[in-house]
Amino acid sequence: MIASRKLFDDSEAAHPITEEEFIKVENIRGKLFLVGAEDDALWDTAKYIRRMEKRLAEQPHTCAVEAVIYEHGTHFVFPDGMLRTMLPVGSALFVKLAFSAAKKYPRECKTARIDIDRRMTRVICDWRDKK
């Protein structure tokens, strides 16, 4: 998989994001569940999550926010069950072939996906139970 993270970083360095271009996350109503990994090779997910958290800390909002950033998890920070549903055969092999961090840190990436599965299930069940 081609790493595009540098492309995103270079693009933002050449044209810093203006206020008008920011996504107004403070206007989101409901639960905002942000998940990313430091070793995302496609874009700097952790930076963007931190940026959204900072914006929410500075702006009035009514959304409930849960943000989780894993050291290892690659760009595929899917819940483990979802990944196995999408790729019932060979999901672990695919992730290892697509992302070098998954090959280097397979246990950590798997642990992150299992934790994401647990957290997302809890968020969805909490939402369902409030209805």
Where in this protein do the model-derived segments appear?
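Mobile cap/lid helix-loop segments that gate and shape the active-site cleft of serine hydrolases
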Residues: 1-23, 100
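Alpha/beta-hydrolase-fold catalytic nucleophile elbow
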Residues: 11, 35, 70-71
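C-terminal catalytic histidine-bearing segment of alpha/beta-hydrolase fold enzymes
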Residues: 50, 61-131
